[in-house]
């Protein structure tokens, strides 16, 4: 009896422990039943009873939750609700706090949706590290949808407004019905076989859960996951969510939003063009300065090395540098011209012709200045080489001989620069401009 007294519960304690047991063990559950005693007071909360043929349970759905319900519940309606058990301790009542509510028919589909979602998540099909980024410069979009639906009209309208240069290839498919999922899978596989687009946009307009059910196919989920092309899912309205949204690399809430996501504003393209031209101009200027420094270095080396060999090496290097400079300039101008033509073609429908003409003239002017500067530099270098050769020629021993002088050496090939170093009978060799003579010393006369 004493032990029993020590374990006496208060009412509050009992209700509290019952609450912990019910809420902790059951968690969130799905419950099917008929609505009765439905009320919607001014607070915006909903209060109702769910019952079957023999039992009933009180339920509450608060304002923040019931705003997502697409219909107004009525007494006698069969519904499927998802919620958690909660105990209202002051009265000792337990109730179901509803988080979502669907008509009974849609409710079965919702259960299947949740089950498939959990399965695919466990298999890793929704993992963030498997999502592929969108290409940076999208030129061609593959749209997988009905060719006659409202979705394709919305997509084409947005793309025509934002970036008319983007090409659209439609892979026609069913988007509703029993064979729609298989049809969508085939369209995705065809696009992956052809590899003619940069990204795929899977889309259709809004509808009921049953209308959109083909986008909750397990086979479609695996097809999207295995696609070599990035996939954007834009199915239904913003409140609609499908399995394809979870598997796709990116989800867009509507078809129009998907087209917005995959296109760039024309103003952004014009800005990118201006930036690209500026970078090319800076690159050309940097290349010119670099080559000028290299030419100056070669000129400095010429002055420090053996004249003839240095001249020969410098002439060879000069020719090589000239060819490389001409080739580099030609390639630069060719690449720049090609990029300008490509950008002009993309922007043609937006008619920025005046701006392109101005930039083209500036580019031609800069190219002309660069060509003139390089030609001037080459001419200056040639003049410096000719001057250096002339200077070397003026101090050459052969040049001295050409002016009427001669050079006399002894048998050891040492220059005979003084008579007191010679003796009678020595053999001497005297070199003139056009030949030499051998002589013998017969008389030595020193000058005082």
UniProtKB/Swiss-Prot annotation:
InterPro entries on file: Exonuc_VII_L, Exonuc_VII_lsu_C, OB-fold_nuc-bd_dom
Catalytic activity entry: Exonucleolytic cleavage in either 5'- to 3'- or 3'- to 5'-direction to yield nucleoside 5'-phosphates
Compartments reported by the entry: Cytoplasm
Any one Gene Ontology BP term: DNA catabolic process
GO cellular component, one term: cytoplasm
Pfam (any one): tRNA_anti_2
GO molecular function term, any single one: exodeoxyribonuclease VII activity
NCBIfam families on file: xseA
Record family assignment: Belongs to the XseA family.
Primary role: Bidirectionally degrades single-stranded DNA into large acid-insoluble oligonucleotides, which are then degraded further into small acid-soluble oligonucleotides.
Subunit structure: Heterooligomer composed of large and small subunits.
The protein's name in its UniProt record: Exodeoxyribonuclease 7 large subunit
Taxonomic source organism: Shewanella baltica (strain OS195)
